[in-house]
Amino acid sequence: MSIATSLGFPRIGRRRELKSALEAHWAGELSEAGLQEAARLLRAESHSLQQGLGIGHIPSNDFALYDHVLDTACMVGAIPPGYGWRGGEVTLPTYFALARGTGGGDAAAGLPALEMTKWFDTNYHYLVPRLAAGQHFAVTANRPLALFREALARHRRTRPVLLGPVSFLLLAKTDDGSDPLDLLDRLLPCYAQVLAELAAEGCAWVQMDEPVLALDLAPKARAALRHAYETLARGATPRLLLASYFAPIADNLPTALALPVAGLHLDLVRGRDDLAPVLAAIGPATWLSLGLVDGRNVWRADLRAALATAREAARALGGSERLMIAPSCSLLHVPVDLAQEDRLDPAIRPWLAFATQKLAEVATIARGLDEGEGAIAEALEASDAALRTRRDSARVHRTDVAARLLGATPEMERRPAPHAARRARQRQRLPLPAFPTTTIGSLPQTSGVRRTRAALARGEIGAAEYDEAIATWTEDAIRLQERIGLDVLVHGEFERNDMVKYFGEQLDGFAFTRHGWVQSYGSRCVAPPIIWGDVARPRPMTVRWARHAQSLTARPVKGMLTGPVTMLQWSFVRDDLPRETVCRQIALALRDEVADLEAAGLAIIQVDEPAFREGLPLRTADREAYLRWAVSCFRLATAVVRDDTAIHTHMCYAEFQDIMPAIATMDADAISIETARSRMELLEAFAGHGPSAYPAEIGPGVWDIHSPRIPPEEEILALLRLARRKLADDQLWVNPDCGLKTRNWREVIPALENLVGAARRLRAEAIPA
């Protein structure tokens, strides 16, 4: 008999209970004990649900209060100096100091948070472990064991999930730039201890996540994997299920298959080609976990096709006794339960599956494999019907959108003049000071803003009253920015609920959920739109409020749009068309909006692409094609303006070195990037030398907005001085790392005042009186 299993379940709860508990704790309204009890209840509910769905191997230690990579760092004592940790179990205040920084308004006493970056090619963010060259590791507390015992007390024998030692090190950074893998022998005793204690407790299986197997690995990394698992195998351990996901294991398969582990998990949604070579080479006693249900998207599985794949594997293995049926990856990346969605279009709803439904699909496939098609005939018929109605829907496939795509030409992707010529015309139109100051876009969305939006949604206020409130907040924001002294203003985006949802709600082809939340980082949750059909813009989306804001001030106000690649990346995308095609549909819709903003008098239009690198395939061989169409889509959306209109863009935390040619080819007039946590390290990619230098203007973030800490003026000035060493003065803008929507005005006003003050001091240094 096969085993239905899961690699991980969403942490946040059906109603975002984790978010509520965390934010209450941070506000001083919930004790540490209360927070831990809320977490315990969430874990119990998750395990009960999975057991009820027929999941045989239920994961534990897939839950984290903030981030599972941070949990691993805390477990092995990888705490940087300065956070007050002196050994022993890491306290909750220290844990949150690492995650969020400390100090608040007391900047002098504050500590910065750990650097944050994207988890592979997803929109989940992890905290980057910071290691010393001679890092000492020690188990501070065996959290996997504690959570195994917690579940065991509820009569559930779970399979703990650990981030594997090699992936942990490759996801980390060292203070001196040395190779983290050099620390492997120091780290392995911690893993050996954790595994031995789990084995002694009667734990049968442990899931070891080594997602770096989906990357192009150097020989040293492959050798590290062999050394790590051979070392661990010499000790007392439960059976290990080695899990990789997000891309094919491909040329790392010989390494994975040679490791002394009891089982191997394959992502057969993104790595279907791995199956045949694994079936041909897998050991006679090794278990195989088949990731047949997409753990990263919301579409219902093709149960008949999945069952056929499971049968193929069973035939090759001589039966289903060594097979596990699973999602492709952790279900962290999808919403919890479709059953909560009572307002979805009834035509679209049958095409979808969230985490709960996906585990039901997993259990159904396992049952069909073991008992035959007849046992799941009703489920197979429902799956077939959903696929058929989606394929044949005239709402999904629109002839007008197809015709416009066919009519798009390469000329539509080219600006009239090169950047140098455009820069002169833009500066003539907007004579800004050296080191101009601005923000990235959004301003704090206070409880009053959220209450007003909710009141409109509930029908408690009308559109006129809502619009009056938005107009008031917008004018207040303009006046505040003028008083602070910012050079280029934003309207604040008070009318926007989310930088993707706001646009998707006004575009054809998008659907929205009420409870479709997924974790981005910590307590930050997003509800991605679902792109279910061809995309088109029925009417202008942002022009009204942009025009209104510009009418209130003589200073330039930026038009603010979310770019086509980010709209794609931060949505659940239809899987019946190539992603490139969907992105071009979005680009054409945004092109019309860009043209309308320019016609409304906006001199700067910012088209944000924070997810541009996030879409980069994990495998090098696949990247050129992605970058080609991603750049093409950005240019298709933006190359509609005159030379004296500036196109800005913004990108979030990422490693830019390997995509710099593509970023330059986007042909934006200015780019802002998140650099505060890395202390301008990311600027190295943009500085370059000669032809490799980024040709346009750059705004390196000087204030980490993901932390409540207020950076002092001296700190911002120091970062700007670092930036001046890498960039020409006429390239440098001064701005925060990201939008300010999630911060409050008590943090934002003094931080912006410090930012403007630092820019003025920098001007004085650069241009002495």
Curated annotation (Swiss-Prot):
What gene, per UniProt, encodes this protein?
metE
Q: Which family does it belong to?
A: Belongs to the vitamin-B12 independent methionine synthase family.
**Where does the chain bind L-methionine?**
I440, G441, S442, E493, D608
Q: Does the keyword Secreted apply?
A: no
Which Gene3D superfamilies does the record cross-reference, listed alphabetically? 3.20.20.210
Q: Which GO terms describe its molecular function?
A: 5-methyltetrahydropteroyltriglutamate-homocysteine S-methyltransferase activity; zinc ion binding
One biological process GO term for this chain? Answer: methylation
Sequence positions that bind 5-methyltetrahydropteroyltri-L-glutamate: R16, E17, L18, K19, K118, R524, C525, W570, E614
Database matches in SUPFAM superfamilies = UROD/MetE-like
Task: Give the residues annotated as active site.
Answer: H706 (proton donor)
Question: What does the organism's lineage look like at the top?
Answer: Bacteria, Pseudomonadati, Pseudomonadota, Alphaproteobacteria, Acetobacterales
Q: Which organism is it from?
A: Acidiphilium cryptum (strain JF-5)
Please tell me where Zn(2+) binds in this chain. H650, C652, E674, C738
Q: Which coenzyme or cofactor does it need?
A: Zn(2+)
What's the top EC group for this one? Answer: transferase
Per its record, how is this protein called by name?
A: 5-methyltetrahydropteroyltriglutamate--homocysteine methyltransferase
Give me the residues that bind L-homocysteine, please. I440, G441, S442, E493, D608
Query: How many cofactors are bound and how?
Result: Binds 1 zinc ion per subunit.
Top-level lineage group: Bacteria
